[in-house]
UniProtKB/Swiss-Prot annotation:
Domain of life, per lineage: Bacteria
Positions of disulphide bridges: none
TM helices/strands, residue ranges: none
Organism (species): Pelotomaculum thermopropionicum (strain DSM 13744 / JCM 10971 / SI)
Entries under HAMAP family matching the protein: UPF0251
Family annotation (InterPro entries): RNA_pol_sigma_r3/r4-like, UPF0251, WH-like_DNA-bd_sf
UniProt xrefs under Pfam families: DUF134 (PF02001)
Listed name of the protein: UPF0251 protein PTH_0588
Family: Belongs to the UPF0251 family.
Entries under PANTHER family matching the protein: PTHR37478, UPF0251 PROTEIN TK0562
Length: 132
């Protein structure tokens, strides 16, 4: 019986979770599902430019496991782009990292996971930053 997968550490929840080719109705498209941790692997390696060892540490997995997650993610994205399928980002086995955040407008501090469209819970400003 295989071991249950470890919970992967994800720093940022995706702000957008669905992509499809322009001009083609959804009824005519098939769909590829990319997990949240697969997207995180692409973000860390391809967008942030980190080495595999550093990415694996950030996600709390071994380097070979990180490599498998990244390879699976790249294969799914390539399939969607080349074959013109929709790409849905959902699910997986992950835990969002909680950070101390501060609003630049009102100074309110709170603990939460980073999300692209997050608002200050006090004044609804989008002008916030992470406190170390």
């Amino acid at each position: 019986m295989p071991r249950p997968p470890k919970c992967r550490r994800v720093e940022q929840f995706p702000g957008f979770t669905f992509f499809k080719p322009s001009g083609i109705p959804m009824s005519e498209l098939s769909e590829v599902v990319l997990s949240v941790e697969e997207l995180e692997a692409i973000r860390l390696r391809d967008l942030e430019g980190m080495e595999h060892e550093e990415c694996a540490g950030k996600m709390s997995v071994s380097r070979p496991t990180f490599h498998r997650i990244l390879a699976s993610a790249r294969q799914k994205v390539a399939h969607a782009l080349i074959n013109g399928t929709a790409l849905r980002i959902t699910g997986g086995n992950f835990k969002l990292v909680q950070y101390m955040l501060e609003c630049r407008r009102c100074g309110h501090r709170w603990k939460g996971a980073i999300c692209r469209r997050m608002l200050c819970p006090s004044c609804s400003s989008m002008d916030w930053h992470r406190i170390e």
